[in-house]
């Protein structure tokens, strides 16, 4: 089965990793959910003749620990992917949802490895950021298709 979502290319548009001088390797590492943020967006690109629909998906990741939090690094990363949608005759809202959930998930997985690789080169051990779900339930105004009954 061919995937309805194809990643054409991706790039990191913003990235910074800072080793924190206040980190104490003798103490346990602290992680606070409120110090970690993830956001995403999906934008349909202008159509080009004889090509399937393209979308730009962007994922922003940021970890900014408070001074008293014992964590080895603060970091931020923005990754952008250009995706092609192979689904024909689909509702635009369904394609946008596919891009926001699946496209963002693909980019987030890549981001986890980029952040791990960059922190591995720092003075403290490398970190692997937590997994993240971009799933959002369908809005209430989108009802599932009705089942047809044969007569």
Task: For every predicted segment, state its role.
Residues 1-106, 113-151:
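N-terminal intrinsically disordered, cationic/polar leader segments
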